[in-house]
């Protein structure tokens, strides 16, 4: 295919119709380098201002040289380029999160509203097959979205209908680690798919067909259920349990960055069935609110806010509260800093005790009232004790007791730290 053919496809799809500035995720591989060539050549026709963003993962000897070459390329094209270096222990998941956090920073800094990536049909096949092996929910087997709105930005993948063989051989960097089978995606690409294609030469097309069919079903269900108010539990529970699950999953599609696991989805179902009133964070900055026969899922405000008896602290925020400085994911320096492992996926609640509070320690549930009696905690200290809560469970009673955090809590691994420092009131 020729470059004008790709331009015509982009124009027909109207990828950039709503955008004046776009950030291109430039890895240096063939797919992203060719996308760079098309977008930079046809900026005028597409009516966009192009901005480049590259992450140097520091995993190969060549990576620093490649970074220099990309800087030269950007200078020759008279385009701005932003570069960040990955540090710390490497994993596919950590690298992916690092990249997208960086891309969002660049977009915020430049005022861009579109993030463009060079994912293509071969990536789509690998992604769907990986998710199938991992046992993911059916809706995710539709694969990578061609266009995806996340908050105030749109991720655009204009090559998703093309295979890598459709791209001309142009100057690019070859990542030799792609030939190694250390990572799951590489094993899919290098071993599993070639073996399965021996059984069915059109196996890749079959996988893409399944993904498209699931997407059709998903869109059809959303259209057919448009007049059903899922948030009205009386209406939701009037259907069979199978239909309830499908309607609830369709409702959750409104929140693309929520991404509940099967276990978390089942937990939400149980809350809706058996809790009369409920309000707690669930995941990724969302909270579930239930009041008798009504419920809703909504984003928590990004700022920490202090209520009458409770404070809500969000990831990468700090707040001083009742003689302590609480820092969620931002390290504090000092000799007397208390550290509590927590999850960054949802907010932390800091409050005083309530009737019926329970602490889970070493797998056993114990009422706070009994714990305070056993530890002979004075009444004044019981009333002033600060409770740290996440996922609806007590993580710690500050200065008194801490939950057993060596296990997964609410299906989410403890992946950051709450730092606490005693300060003067």
From Swiss-Prot:
Got a GO cellular component term for this one? cytoplasm
GO MF annotation, one: ATP binding
Q: Which CDD domains match?
A: TilS_N (cd01992)
Q: Which domain of life is it from?
A: Bacteria
Q: Name one GO biological process term.
A: tRNA modification
Q: Name one Pfam family in it.
A: ATP_bind_3
Keyword Ligase annotated? yes
Give the EC number(s) under which this enzyme is classified. 6.3.4.19
Q: Which reaction does it catalyse?
A: cytidine(34) in tRNA(Ile2) + L-lysine + ATP = lysidine(34) in tRNA(Ile2) + AMP + diphosphate + H(+)
Q: What does this protein do?
A: Ligates lysine onto the cytidine present at position 34 of the AUA codon-specific tRNA(Ile) that contains the anticodon CAU, in an ATP-dependent manner. Cytidine is converted to lysidine, thus changing the amino acid specificity of the tRNA from methionine to isoleucine.
Comment block on domains? The N-terminal region contains the highly conserved SGGXDS motif, predicted to be a P-loop motif involved in ATP binding.
The similarity comment for this entry is: Belongs to the tRNA(Ile)-lysidine synthase family.
Descriptive protein name? tRNA(Ile)-lysidine synthase
| Source organism phylogeny | Bacteria, Bacillati, Bacillota, Bacilli, Lactobacillales
């Amino acid at each position: 295919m020729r470059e004008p053919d790709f331009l015509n496809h982009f124009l027909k799809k109207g990828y950039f119709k709503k955008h004046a500035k776009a950030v291109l995720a430039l890895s240096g591989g063939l797919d992203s380098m060719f996308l760079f060539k098309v977008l930079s050549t046809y900026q005028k026709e597409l009516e966009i201002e192009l901005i480049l963003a590259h992450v140097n993962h520091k995993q190969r000897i060549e990576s620093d040289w490649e970074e220099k070459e990309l800087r030269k390329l950007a200078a020759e094209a008279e385009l701005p380029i932003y570069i960040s270096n990955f540090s710390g222990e490497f994993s596919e998941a950590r690298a992916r999160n690092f990249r997208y956090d960086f891309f969002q920073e660049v977009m915020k800094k430049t005022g861009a509203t579109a993030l463009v990536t060079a994912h293509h049909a071969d990536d789509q096949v690998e992604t769907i097959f990986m998710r199938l092996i991992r046992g993911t929910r059916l809706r995710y087997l539709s694969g990578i979205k061609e266009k995806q709105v996340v908050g105030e930005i749109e991720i655009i993948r204009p090559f998703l209908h093309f295979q890598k063989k459709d791209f001309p051989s142009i100057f690019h960097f070859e990542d030799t680690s792609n030939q190694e089978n250390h990572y799951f995606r590489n094993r899919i690409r290098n071993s599993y798919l070639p073996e399965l294609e021996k059984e069915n030469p059109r196996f890749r097309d079959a996988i893409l067909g399944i993904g498209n069919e699931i997407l059709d079903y998903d869109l059809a269900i959303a259209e057919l259920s448009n007049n059903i108010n899922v948030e009205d539990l009386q209406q939701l529970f009037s259907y069979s349990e199978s239909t309830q699950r499908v309607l609830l999953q369709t409702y959750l599609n409104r929140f693309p960055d929520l991404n509940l696991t099967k276990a978390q989805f089942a937990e939400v179902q149980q809350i809706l069935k058996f809790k009369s009133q409920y309000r707690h964070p669930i995941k990724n900055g969302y909270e579930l609110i239930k009041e008798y026969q009504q419920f809703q899922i909504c984003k928590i405000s990004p700022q920490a806010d202090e209520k009458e008896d409770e404070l809500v602290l969000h990831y990468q925020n700090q707040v001083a509260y009742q003689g302590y400085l609480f820092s969620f994911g931002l390290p504090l320096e000092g000799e007397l800093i208390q550290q509590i492992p927590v999850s960054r996926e949802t907010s932390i609640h800091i409050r005083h005790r309530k009737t019926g509070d329970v602490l889970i320690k070493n797998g056993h549930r114990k009422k706070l009232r009994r714990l305070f009696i056993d530890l002979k905690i004075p009444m004044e200290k019981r009333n002033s004790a600060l409770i740290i809560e996440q996922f609806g469970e007590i993580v710690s009673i500050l200065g008194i007791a801490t939950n057993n955090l060596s296990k997964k809590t609410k299906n989410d691994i403890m992946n950051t730290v709450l730092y606490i420092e005693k300060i003067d009131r």
